[in-house]
């Protein structure tokens, strides 16, 4: 225990503990059976067999439940106004997805008050917490003027440390046919204004959004201001997004539904994470990424929910885990790792997505004896308790909830 006045917590009665640390447990997930976890001062102090657990000031007997690191959501778009349920219904009736739908959200976001945007973002973060996400990245991208993007970055930064400037989402309506002019504005006054509130710079490198040269300009302008690059790429067809991400050393390239062997090889030889977003492919009836080919080649894979009002209005990583196992041919172990340690890799974080001494005490317990149930029982709300920074943030059994700023 640490020599301070904090109260230590010990979780006992853990049926299966996922640590994601193979040095302390079995296999890549570092599994420990009949386990215990101790946290103190907001960090993990000890993990191991329950019969060797040190005493804590506060104890919780989990009665055989499985325990995992909190999910790490590395891709979300939570600052927006309105919704697009009618667009979803039309798409399900056979109309193809087009990026133009984003422009409907741009209008609704611009028309929303600060209070409305803040409340909606909090609501979605609360929802994410209830499904087990304890670290959430949040993108802008629905304001697309300097003032509106600055407002979005400020709202996001008030709620999470993982803020991404996605000003280059699609060219806004007032820049129709003038994407280069919009890019020039993003690369100058918009990044200048928003960079102090953000950590990441992102771009949608896709036909109908921004081409390779435009995406390169946005990313390098952000990098010049200290932002770390991420890329939306290869979602709708093969394209330059993957190769651009690797070239610039991006933390991740997200979607990657359409890849060549050269794309897969480039990712395998790089540190760029491939973040797969099955919720978007489910909701648009798009082709799922070839996760098996990526994993077999040695690519680091993360899973994200991609919560947004147009193409993936879900905050549930358990739902995405089930899809990844059923339709993307990932094993349950691979999907769990991708939603925890993989998301942490995509955010370049070593303190989350893992349960080992010194890691942040972000922990979730399931109403199930094994983590396998997350894929085995799709659609069932299995997350029973969530601790964030060592504090009980939500419990299905008590209704206890403290889902606020993700600090």
UniProtKB/Swiss-Prot annotation:
Pathway: Amino-acid degradation; L-histidine degradation into L-glutamate; N-formimidoyl-L-glutamate from L-histidine: step 3/3. Binds 1 zinc or iron ion per subunit. The gene is hutI. N-formimidoyl-L-glutamate binds at residues 142, 308, 310. This is Imidazolonepropionase. Pfam families: Amidohydro_1. Its cofactor is Zn(2+); Fe(3+). Its EC number is 3.5.2.7. It is found in: Cytoplasm. Its main location: cytoplasm. Gene3D superfamilies: Metal-dependent hydrolases, Urease, subunit C, domain 1. Zn(2+) binds at residues 75, 77, 232, 306. Keywords: Cytoplasm, Histidine metabolism, Hydrolase, Iron, Metal-binding, Zinc. It comes from Rhodococcus jostii (strain RHA1). GO terms for molecular function: imidazolonepropionase activity; iron ion binding; zinc ion binding. Signal peptide: none annotated. GO terms for cellular component: cytoplasm. The keyword Isomerase does not apply. Catalyzes the hydrolytic cleavage of the carbon-nitrogen bond in imidazolone-5-propanoate to yield N-formimidoyl-L-glutamate. It is the third step in the universal histidine degradation pathway. GO terms for biological process: L-histidine catabolic process to glutamate and formamide; L-histidine catabolic process to glutamate and formate.
């Amino acid at each position: 225990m640490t020599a301070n006045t904090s109260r230590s917590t010990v979780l006992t009665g853990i049926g299966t503990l996922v640590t994601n640390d193979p040095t302390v447990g079995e296999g890549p997930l570092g599994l420990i059976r009949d386990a215990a976890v101790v946290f103190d001062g907001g960090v993990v102090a000890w993990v191991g067999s329950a019969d060797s657990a040190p005493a804590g000031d506060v104890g919780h007997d989990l009665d055989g439940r499985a325990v995992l690191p909190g999910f790490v959501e590395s891709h979300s778009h939570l600052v927006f106004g309105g919704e697009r349920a009618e667009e979803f219904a039309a798409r399900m009736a056979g109309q193809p997805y087009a990026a133009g739908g984003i422009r409907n959200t741009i209008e609704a976001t611009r028309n929303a008050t600060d209070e409305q945007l803040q409340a909606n973002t909090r609501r979605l973060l609360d929802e994410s917490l209830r499904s087990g996400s304890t670290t959430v990245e949040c993108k802008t991208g629905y304001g697309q003027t300097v003032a509106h993007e600055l407002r979005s970055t400020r709202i996001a930064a008030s709620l999470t440390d993982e803020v991404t400037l996605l000003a280059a989402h699609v060219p806004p309506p007032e820049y129709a046919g003038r994407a280069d002019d919009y890019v020039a504005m993003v690369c100058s006054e918009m990044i200048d204004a928003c960079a102090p509130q953000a950590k990441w710079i992102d771009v949608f490198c896709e036909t109908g959004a921004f081409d390779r040269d435009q995406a390169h300009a946005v990313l390098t302008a952000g990098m010049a201001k200290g932002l770390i690059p991420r890329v939306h790429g290869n979602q709708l067809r093969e394209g330059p997004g993957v190769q651009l991400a690797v070239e610039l050393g991006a933390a991740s390239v997200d979607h990657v539904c359409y890849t060549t062997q050269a794309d897969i090889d480039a990712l395998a030889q790089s540190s760029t994470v491939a973040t797969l977003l099955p919720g978007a492919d489910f909701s648009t009836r798009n082709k799922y990424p070839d996760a098996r080919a990526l994993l077999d080649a040695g690519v680091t894979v993360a899973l994200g929910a991609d919560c947004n009002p147009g193409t993936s209005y879900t905050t549930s990583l358990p739902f995405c885990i089930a899809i990844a196992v059923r339709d993307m041919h990932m094993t349950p172990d691979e999907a769990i790792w991708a939603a925890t340690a993989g998301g942490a890799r995509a955010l370049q974080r070593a303190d989350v997505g893992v349960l080992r001494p010194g890691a942040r005490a972000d922990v979730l317990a399931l109403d199930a004896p094994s983590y396998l149930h997350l894929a085995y029982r799709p659609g069932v709300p299995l997350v029973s308790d969530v601790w964030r920074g060592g504090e009980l943030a939500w419990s299905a059994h008590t209704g206890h909830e403290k889902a606020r700023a993700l600090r």
